[in-house]
C-alpha cells in the first residue's frame, strides 16, 4: 500500500482532538465519528501503523485483529509535525514540494514541513534575499 499523506494528517488531527490525560483515541472499524470516513479500514490501519513506526504516535494497542485500535496520544515529534502542517496552505505547499522532489515518505514530509515553516518565519522577518 502506498503512503497517503492526507490520511496521516487526518489521523494525527483526530488523535490530537481526542487525546488528553483522561481520553485515548479509540478507533473501531465501523466508526465514522472522526475525520476518517474518506479512507478504508485497511488504509487507516496501515497509516496508524506507519505513524507508530515513525514515532508520531505512542501507546498504540491493537485488539480483535485490528478492528479496534487504541492510541494513547501524539508523541512529541507528532505534535511538532502537526504544528508545522496544521494550516492547509502550508500542508498543500509541503505536498507540492514532496511531489516535485519525488518522495512522500514520512521522514521527507517531516523535513519539508520544518523547512517550509523556517522559510515562512524568515520571510515574516524579512530575512529572505
Predicted feature locations:
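Generic structural signal for hydrophobic core residues of well-folded globular domains
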Residues: 15-18, 51, 82-85
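Basic amphipathic alpha-helical segments that dock to polyanions
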Residues: 43-55
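N-terminal intrinsically disordered, cationic/polar leader segments
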Residues: 18, 29-32, 50, 107, ...
Amino acid at each position: 500500500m502506498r503512503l497517503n499523506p492526507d490520511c496521516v494528517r487526518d489521523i494525527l488531527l483526530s488523535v490530537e482532538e481526542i487525546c488528553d490525560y483522561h481520553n485515548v483515541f479509540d478507533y473501531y472499524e465501523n466508526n465514522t465519528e472522526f475525520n476518517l470516513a474518506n479512507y478504508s479500514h485497511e488504509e487507516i490501519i496501515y497509516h496508524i501503523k506507519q505513524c507508530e513506526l515513525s514515532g508520531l504516535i505512542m501507546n498504540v494497542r491493537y485488539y480483535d485483529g485490528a478492528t479496534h485500535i487504541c492510541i494513547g496520544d501524539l508523541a512529541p515529534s507528532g505534535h511538532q509535525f502537526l504544528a508545522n502542517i496544521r494550516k492547509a496552505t502550508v500542508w498543500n505547499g509541503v505536498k507540492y514540494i514532496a511531489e516535485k522532489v519525488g518522495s512522500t515518505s514520512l521522514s521527507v514530509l517531516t523535513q519539508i514541513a520544518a523547512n517550509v515553516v523556517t522559510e515562512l518565519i524568515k520571510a515574516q522577518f524579512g530575512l529572505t534575499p
